[in-house]
Amino acid sequence: MAPKRGSSPAIAGHCSLILSRGLPSVRVTDSNRQKKLIRHLHTFLLYLPADTSCGYRPECGAASFRTRQSSLMVSSEMPNTSTLRLCTVCASNNNRSMESHRVLKEAGYDVSSYGTGSAVRLPGLSIDKPNVYPFGTPYNDIYNDLLAQSAERYKSNGLLEMLDRNRRIKKAPEKWHDSQKVFDFVFTCEERCFDSVCEDLMNRGGQLNKIVHVINLDIRDDNENAKIGGRAMLELVKALNSKMQECDQQGVPFEDTIMDVVADWQQAHPQLPLLYSPAYY
């Protein structure tokens, strides 16, 4: 069922929609009842400003946002005291996830990065012959291999600069499915990576009963858009971290408020469609 547009809950609290895995869409008019449903039914609360439309993906329990206008208020800079464990994910753990890794690391966050592809694939000297490497191949080795193939070609398309950045951050690209680390937030950079992460977490069985928030930002796979996406991801992380600290101080469950944060962020970044799904370790 396609949700109808309404007014922002900041203006009219009656226009809220609850979307739940395996449950029909439910409209709720009372804010206290909203919170109870979120806590007890493990639902996803989505606020719909008048200029926002949304979609729900029952196959992965994800809420998606599409916004046409921007009105996010940027908070003043504060020292980073976050203890969040973050993760960025793209297909090959080379461009988008590594640029976001760099940005978040330089901002002082505890961050790791991974790829979900079957192998690391980078453009080759011809379109039909990409360079393919196993995950775990050191960035320095990949750099030297491309340098030997054609320094001029790979310098002009930015691959050598990208790999030089990567080898300064960590040793080699890592595969998501081989990682046993536990994160608070996982940020993927395209929908197929989001689906892969959600499916893998579901297959792990959730034995730790530890919630993880999986968020996808649809970032185009080129140098410039990777930088744009990295900056936007940092802005989202700052907003989420600030809200978590606020919730801790007020004794409010963060899960009740996360959709406010992502909806505000999406208004400011309509060019980066967002998908969200909670999952469990």
Swiss-Prot record:
GO terms for biological process: intracellular phosphate ion homeostasis; mRNA 3'-end processing; positive regulation of telomere maintenance via semi-conservative replication; regulation of pericentric heterochromatin formation; regulation of siRNA-independent facultative heterochromatin formation; sno(s)RNA transcription; termination of RNA polymerase II transcription; termination of RNA polymerase II transcription, exosome-dependent. It is an enzyme of class 3 (hydrolase). GO terms for cellular component: chromatin; mRNA cleavage and polyadenylation specificity factor complex. Its EC number is 3.1.3.16. It is found in: Nucleus. Keywords: Hydrolase, mRNA processing, Nucleus, Protein phosphatase. The keyword Nucleus applies. The keyword Amino-acid biosynthesis does not apply. It catalyses: O-phospho-L-seryl-[protein] + H2O = L-seryl-[protein] + phosphate; O-phospho-L-threonyl-[protein] + H2O = L-threonyl-[protein] + phosphate. One of its GO terms (molecular function) is RNA polymerase II CTD heptapeptide repeat S5 phosphatase activity. Its main location: nucleus. Component of the cleavage and polyadenylation factor (CPF) complex. Component of the cleavage and polyadenylation factor (CPF) complex, which plays a key role in polyadenylation-dependent pre-mRNA 3'-end formation and cooperates with cleavage factors including the CFIA complex and NAB4/CFIB. SSU72 is required for 3'-end formation of snoRNAs. Belongs to the SSU72 phosphatase family. This is RNA polymerase II subunit A C-terminal domain phosphatase SSU72. It comes from Eremothecium gossypii (strain ATCC 10895 / CBS 109.51 / FGSC 9923 / NRRL Y-1056). The gene is SSU72.
